[in-house]
Amino acid sequence: MPGVEDPCDSQGTPPEEPSTSVAPGEAAKEQSPRLCGYLAKLSGKGPLRSFKNRWFVLDPRKCQFYYFKHHQDAQPLGQIDIGDASFSYDLEAEEGQFEIHSAGRVSILRAPSRHAMTYWLQELQQKRWEYCNSFGALKRESVINPASTKVPIGLVARESPDYMGIPNINDAERARNQFAVETCPSVLGDQTSAEQASNNPAAVQVLLRQWSNDIRSSMQHLRPGKSSDCRKSTFYTNEEWELLNPTPKELEESLLHVEKRKPPTEGIKGSTGMSFPFDFGRIPQRARRPLREIMGVNKNRTECLADSLPVSDSRMESDVLLKLQSQEEELERLKKDLLSQKELVRLLQQSLRSSQYDKYFASPFCDGLSKEHLHLLQQKDTQIQELNHLLERQTLEKDHLHQEVEELKCSVKELKDQLNMMMETIQAKDEVIMRLSRQLSKYEQHTPSSTVAAEIPVAPQLEELNRLQDSLQGYKAQNTFLNKEILELSALRRNAERREREMEARYSNLEAKMCQIESKYLVLLQEMKTPVCSDDQGTAREFVNQLLEDALKVENAEQPEHTFVKPHTVSKYDIHGFLIVPEDDEEEEKLVAKVRALDLKTLSLTENQEISNVVKWDNYFASTVNREMACSPELKALVRNGIPHEHRSRMWKWFTNLHIKKLKDEAAPGYFQSLLQNALEKQNPASKQIELDLMRTLPNNKHYTSPTSEGIQKLRNVLLAYSWRNPDIGYCQGINRLAAIALLYLDQEDAFWCLVTIVEAFMPRDYYTKTLLGSQVDQRVFKDLMNEKLPRLCAHFEQYKVDYTLITFNWFLVVFVDSVVSDILFRIWDSLLYEGSKVIFRFALGLFKYKEEEILKLQDSMSIFKYLRYFSRTILDARKLCNIAFVDMNPFPLRQIRNRRTYHLEKVRLELSELEAIRADFIRERETNPERRDLISDDEEDS
């Protein structure tokens, strides 16, 4: 983790700056880098108060600032609410110290430097602004209105909150950014600085300004009189800077000029033992101008060069210089090759002449001459060759001397130019010295004679001036920060007032509606109290009909609404998209469904259990800020109490990865997409049945009501991909509902892996095959558990010969989908995905235990079976059901279920094999017996 250090003791020096890190585990891929780092916190009481290093982590979801003793700790020492906090700092206090005012308390913190303090304050202000001006700020009302909470993925995430959108706050944000303090990039963590540079245009400007300053500082040694190693003056002319993009001809001339100039210059330096401090070699021969003109141009250029030079131009110049250097090296190499080729040609010419002479002496013309003449001719030829060689050497030496003379002339000319410029420089410096001398003499004439006495108070005054300037800069920064803080707090206060007005309007609307209903009931009671004189009840019947009609009304989006918010009444769908009041049922059943929905909402509003559960989950996530989530009794208890709506998507994904991590790691990247592509491109025997069952999967859920619904498209993809993955199952009616429930909180790929987890990891083999062997075995196991846990109820069923497995078979196959209300359904799924299929037995027993007394009161098989078909939907208290399933049903060992599954598996296999043998005998007898064939109907023959 960048910038994280473990302090040696509580009084040690904290790390230099805050840092950003990514939350561990799988959630790290989804969450943005979080703000964390060491700060010194003032703690203790009375005179024992002291600063102690604490590891601070900001949770942006709740805008809570948690602090730990060390960054490895799991439990925080405390927390500071940043959402309702204000910030300040005092210049008179220690460097880096600032205060956070929140919930009536003042927390005093200290950063290692002023830059780090500025960065912390800016980040905390930004997080507070984002939290208070986003829909996440409405999560504080999510207990009353769960639908207003957004989840990251899944079909439920498409739900928009009931509150209207927050007004445009760009004006406040723009005014707020005017007071933003620029932070030095060195203070930022690696990831934070990279993010700010890519996401914030202002940060890009800061980086560009910093690069410009770096260029300016790197060019200081180029200015006259600024070098520390030698008094060297360097002048740059317009022509010199134009050489950055030279033409090829100018480049060649310049290189030749340098080639000619180097040898004599070195020779002169070596002979005279001195070197001139002026570097005029960079200036071309044609670029000579008077010194005063050059100095004037140079002065203007050095003043505006660093500020006007863009970063992009400097990059282009560096690229051009690199290309120029490579071309120079290439030119040097080609010149060397040319010289070697010339030398080779010369040697070849000499060898050619020698061979011609040898050939001449070997020719027939020399056959008639005597040996003395031949010897004399050979000597003459040798002398001629030597003379030719000598002539060539003399010619080369002459050319070389001529070249040296030309170079010496050029160097003499350059030295004269340098001497003239040096003389002009000396003259200019003499003029400056004379002018300064005259000014000094005038100053001495007008000042008292005792100059030493006048210089004594100058040093303290300068120190005081510097101190005042530093204080002025500090107060300016403090004033800027406080202006920004005041502006931001004002905007947040206006937003809070707006939300308060909306809540008041909403409550006024609900109160008015409550008064209307109450007045109608009072009138109805008054009418019912009066004696009835005839069979016609008159007004009372009208009031009853009116009340029933009002109760069955469902909120319509086209009805006029309040100006600010929608009245939060019972809507047509629940938070998960399930239809509350059936559309095709009779009026009496609609009324019962409406009453059930109102009872369920009353439970969620009146009980404090849901609120405490949300707080427990928030505390749990706060304890996992510095560590990965792991299986623990604490997490098990939380899951059994139910996962809050806003955390369910994250936890379901984590549960899936927990159970099939090995399978996912073995799968190739893009495994789901490749399966889906194969299923779509190739012939799939299960695709036809999948298409038939898509619209019948969850017809009472608005995400699956239309063929063009997003849920239908995703469900098709998941089922096709799984049918291609597992050919033994392919597609079985039942897994479509499992996938549909998973898609409500997960995306396509995660829902696919969730389906794999349930079918292949949780359920026994052959659970969804053609024989449904595993499902039949589980029904036998459930019968044994019923005899053990609920003997009275089991005896009651046996007395009236009621086979309750006809009802429970579907519970196990689709994990209670369409069998219980949605709130209980998702509580069951929470525990299922964490603990496995044992949970299904617990809840099935819990449902019967919940309604045991009501079932025992029924005294005939028809009424019992009719009651079993719908009784599970009448159970609304999820907390009571979970308490029965996880407390009253104990002990409930998994080993017992495994042993009973193994025992019944052999029995069911034996029965299935016997049935298969009977079926085979029947088919064989029907085929061989003509009399039996005559009994076959026409329809059977067609089939």
Curated annotation (Swiss-Prot):
InterPro entries: PH-like_dom_sf, PH_domain, Rab-GAP-TBC_dom, Rab-GAP_TBC_sf, Rab_GAP_TBC_domain. GO terms for cellular component: early endosome. Its main location: other. Pfam families: PH, RabGAP-TBC. One of its GO terms (molecular function) is GTPase activator activity. The keyword Ribonucleoprotein does not apply. The keyword Coiled coil applies. Keywords: Coiled coil, Endosome, GTPase activation. Residues 642-836 form the Rab-GAP TBC domain. Residues 315-514 form a coiled coil. Residues 1-29 are annotated as: Disordered. Residues 10-22 have a biased composition (Polar residues). Residues 32-129 form the PH domain. This is TBC1 domain family member 2B. It comes from Xenopus tropicalis (Western clawed frog).
